[in-house]
Amino acid sequence: MVTELRVFYLVPLLLASYVQTTPRPEKMKMDCYKDVKGTIYDYEALSLNGKEHIPFKQYAGKHVLFVNVATYCGLTIQYPELNALQEDLKPFGLVILGFPCNQFGKQEPGDNLEILPGLKYVRPGKGFLPNFQLFAKGDVNGENEQKIFTFLKRSCPHPSETVVMSKHTFWEPIKVHDIRWNFEKFLVGPDGIPVMRWFHQAPVSTVKSDIMAYLSHFKTI
């Protein structure tokens, strides 16, 4: 099985060294709009195994970090860092949710059942498994984007003012608040309202510092 995975994903692995680059944004993080209509509790998503629709209202009272992920990306090194972030901040109510997507460099080519083996045996490999919930693979931009991402993007301006059109991106139409690449992040507060958004190039250490500063207002750290 390991050999089959390595052969099947040869092309995505060659592409994994490619991380979309843009002119450095003015900010790595942006606060979300103050007049957001609705909450994440109005939405749900299909679990990675396809057996369960998980309503986001089950995360009421939690601080939720939404991340669009990919197995064969140069930023896949963030997976272990996200595991550590979940472990460190879980006692303070943080929940990380991962959403596999193949729209950026086609770096999530497998079906849902192939994603966890790819992570475990290929990249990051060495038996790695995420300690946070993964959902079924789907679009985060374009006409078939998941509704939760329509809501998140509408609620939060993008840190970069540059809209990138590239042969490595696969969706239409292109919109100003679109996710630019794998591993962008949105933080949602315990009331279900989006709080802040990070550019994909923001280090997880920076994301952690920002979240801890935010949590300090709740007197939980």
UniProtKB/Swiss-Prot annotation:
UniProt KW keywords: Oxidoreductase, Peroxidase, Secreted, Signal
Organism, as annotated: Mus musculus (Mouse)
Gene behind this protein: Gpx5
GO cellular component, one term: sperm plasma membrane
Major subcellular site: secreted
Catalytic reaction equation(s): 2 glutathione + H2O2 = glutathione disulfide + 2 H2O
GO molecular function, one term: glutathione peroxidase activity
PROSITE patterns: GLUTATHIONE_PEROXID_1, GLUTATHIONE_PEROXID_2, GLUTATHIONE_PEROXID_3
Signal sequence, renumbered to the chain: 1-21
Residues annotated as catalytic: C73
EC numbers for this chain: 1.11.1.9
Keyword Secreted applies: yes
Tissue specificity annotation: Epididymis.
Pfam families: GSHPx
InterPro entries reported for this sequence: Glutathione_peroxidase, GPX_AS, GPX_CS, Thioredoxin-like_sf
GO BP: cellular response to oxidative stress
Name of the protein in its database record: Epididymal secretory glutathione peroxidase
Organism superkingdom: Eukaryota
Family that this chain belongs to: Belongs to the glutathione peroxidase family.
Reported function: Protects cells and enzymes from oxidative damage, by catalyzing the reduction of hydrogen peroxide, lipid peroxides and organic hydroperoxide, by glutathione. May constitute a glutathione peroxidase-like protective system against peroxide damage in sperm membrane lipids.
Location(s) in or outside the cell: Secreted
Lineage: Eukaryota, Metazoa, Chordata, Craniata, Vertebrata
